Structures are given as C-alpha cells and as structure tokens.
From Swiss-Prot:
One of its GO terms (molecular function) is zinc ion binding. A zinc finger (unnamed) spans 3-34. It comes from Pseudothermotoga lettingae (strain ATCC BAA-301 / DSM 14385 / NBRC 107922 / TMO). Belongs to the NrdR family. Keywords: ATP-binding, DNA-binding, Metal-binding, Nucleotide-binding, Repressor, Transcription, Transcription regulation, Zinc, Zinc-finger. Its cofactor is Zn(2+). It holds the Pfam family ATP-cone. Binds 1 zinc ion. PROSITE patterns: ATP_CONE. Disulfide bonds: none annotated. This is Transcriptional repressor NrdR. GO terms for biological process: negative regulation of DNA-templated transcription.
Length: 154
C-alpha cells in the first residue's frame, strides 16, 4: 500500500487483527522506504447509500465526511478515535439495515445524536447545535435542560 507520508508504493504489514465488532480488519503498516507507520482498515463494500438532503439534493454517503463531523464535535473531549470509528461504523450498518439505498440526512443526524448522547453530552450538544442549526442561545439552553432532566430521571 502507498505510504501516505512519502508516497512510496510499498509497505509491510506489522500487525493485522479484526476490529472489536468484527466488521473490518485493522492493519498496522510500515513504509519500507521512510519507515513511517500508519494504520489501514479493510471493510466489506455494501450497496452505495444515497443521502437525500433537506433541500432534496442527493449525494453519495461519505463515511469520512460523517467521521469528520463527529471528530469536530468531539474535539478536546476524552473520547478515543476508536470509539468514534465504532460510532460511524454502527451508523453505517444501521443505514444499510434500512434496506433502502436512499436515506434522508435527518435519519443520519438522529442516529449520530443518539449515539453521541450516550458517549459524551458535550459532544452531543456540539453536534446537535450544528445539525439542528442553532441560531439562538435559548436553543442551547433547551437542549442542556433536556439532558439535565434525563439525568434526574436516571
């Protein structure tokens, strides 16, 4: 595999193991030219998912775009990259299980928010503020009150 650091076309596999959920193979690699180490994931390929946006536009589901959005919400939070990878994997599998190739973006956002809420409440609020397009401080207060209310019930 091509090295992402120096571009050399060859690397060797140092370690190979399945991910915890068994849906991918994680490989630790080393470039034979520059010695840099990097990780790759091998996943099965399923039917392409088309995301139907709020305005009706359609675009191919982009796993990395979803992961980047989740990473942004979790910035400077004590959440491992592996946890976020797993979250994205679970969302993608849930979308595949829908049985439809066209999925509304609203469903994706709701799935992510549901999972983030269980992982980290600050990340949940951050993601929700972008996803729901908060424009007023009261919207933040409402979601925080909702979280506090849920904590009192538990």
């Amino acid at each position: 595999m091509k090295c992402p650091f120096c571009g050399h076309p060859d690397s060797r596999v140092l370690d190979s193991r399945p991910t915890l959920d068994g849906t991918a193979i994680r490989r630790r690699r080393e470039c034979i030219e520059c010695g840099a180490r990097f990780t790759t994931y091998e996943r099965y390929e399923l039917l392409p998912i088309i995301v139907v946006k709020k305005d009706g536009r359609r675009e191919t589901f982009d796993r990395s775009k979803l992961l980047n959005g989740v990473l942004k919400a979790c910035e400077k939070r004590p959440i491992s990259y592996e946890t976020l990878e797993k979250l994205v994997e679970e969302v993608e599998l849930a979308l595949q299980k829908q049985g439809s190739t066209e999925i509304p973006s609203k469903l994706i956002g709701e799935l992510v928010m549901s999972k983030l809420r269980q992982i980290d409440q600050v990340a949940y609020v951050r993601f929700a503020s972008v996803y729901k397009d908060f424009r007023e401080i009261d919207q933040f207060l409402d979601i925080v009150r909702e979280l506090k209310k849920d904590q009192e019930v538990d």
